């Protein structure tokens, strides 16, 4: 009996030594529970600050460029400028500064729900006409246009995300938390839609798109 136990120990000893050597020199890296969120950066490589103002600029120059600005929507009866546009070139006026207001926390991360607000002096009447939202479907353009008149913390029409572009810079997404059926463009796994550009009365208007999202950068003011 003792002889059998001795032989068994001799057989198991190399396996134990190999296992110890393998795990110490070649540790098994198990995947983490969730990826570490990345902070959104401005054109200087600084982390975006909810208390700072930024211009949303294009990643392209010349006729392909152009900053985002607040303008009057065609045929609108709103008492204040209520459209989110992009200049037709980066040569000319600068865009309207915005600030980003995260749903929670004091930092701005990629793929995080937030509100976007034009950060400009305004009269009391126009206070709500600085907060971005997505309007109803425009039958002529067959899309949903970005406009102002939103509400901070409003779940259905005023929440956006900043995500890394597959090309360069960042993309903006519109992400309603509820009533997804009201957004036929919100087709990804998170019920978000890409923000791009359409032409409205000769102007570049920000709108929801299926392809060619707008690649942007954030320049601190």
From Swiss-Prot:
Superkingdom of this protein's organism: Eukaryota
Cleaved propeptide residues: 24-32
Pfam families according to UniProt: Kunitz_legume
Classification via SMART domains: STI
Record site feature (Reactive bond for chymotrypsin), residues: 144-145
Location(s), subcellular: Vacuole
Position of the signal peptide: 1-23
Tissue localization of expression: Tubers, leaves.
Record keywords, A-Z: Aspartic protease inhibitor, Disulfide bond, Glycoprotein, Protease inhibitor, Serine protease inhibitor, Signal, Vacuole
Cited PROSITE patterns: SOYBEAN_KUNITZ
Gene Ontology molecular function: aspartic-type endopeptidase inhibitor activity; serine-type endopeptidase inhibitor activity
Renumbered ranges of motif Vacuolar targeting signal: 26-31
Disulphide linkage map: 80-126, 175-186
Record flagged with keyword Disulfide bond: yes
Glycosylation sites: 51
Residues the record marks as site: Reactive bond for trypsin: 99-100
Chief place where the protein resides: other
Keyword Glycoprotein among UniProt keywords: yes
SUPFAM superfamilies assigned: STI-like
One GO CC term on file: vacuole
Function recorded in the entry: Inhibitor of cathepsin D (aspartic protease). May also inhibit trypsin and chymotrypsin (serine proteases). Protects the plant by inhibiting proteases of invading organisms.
This protein's name: Aspartic protease inhibitor 7
Organism annotation: Solanum tuberosum (Potato)
């Amino acid at each position: 009996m003792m002889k059998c136990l001795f032989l068994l120990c001799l057989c198991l000893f190399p396996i134990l030594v190999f296992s110890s050597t393998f795990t110490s020199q070649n540790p098994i890296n198990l995947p983490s529970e969730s990826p570490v969120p990345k902070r959104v950066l401005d054109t200087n490589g600084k982390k975006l600050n909810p208390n700072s103002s930024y211009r949303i600029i294009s990643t392209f120059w010349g006729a392909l460029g152009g900053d985002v600005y607040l303008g009057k929507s065609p045929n609108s009866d709103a008492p204040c400028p209520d459209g989110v546009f992009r200049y037709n070139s980066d040569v000319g006026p600068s865009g309207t500064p915005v600030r980003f207001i995260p749903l929670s926390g004091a930092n701005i991360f990629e793929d995080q729900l937030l509100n976007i607000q034009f950060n400009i002096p305004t009269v009391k009447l126009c206070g709500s006409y600085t907060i971005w939202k997505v309007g109803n479907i425009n039958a002529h353009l067959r899309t949903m246009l970005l406009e102002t008149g939103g509400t901070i913390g409003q779940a259905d029409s005023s929440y956006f995300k900043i995500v890394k572009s597959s090309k360069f810079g960042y993309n903006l997404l519109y992400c309603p938390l509820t009533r997804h059926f009201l957004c036929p463009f919100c087709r990804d796994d998170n019920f978000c839609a890409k923000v791009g550009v359409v032409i409205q009365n000769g102007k570049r208007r920000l709108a929801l798109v299926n392809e060619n999202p707008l690649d942007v950068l954030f320049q601190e003011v």
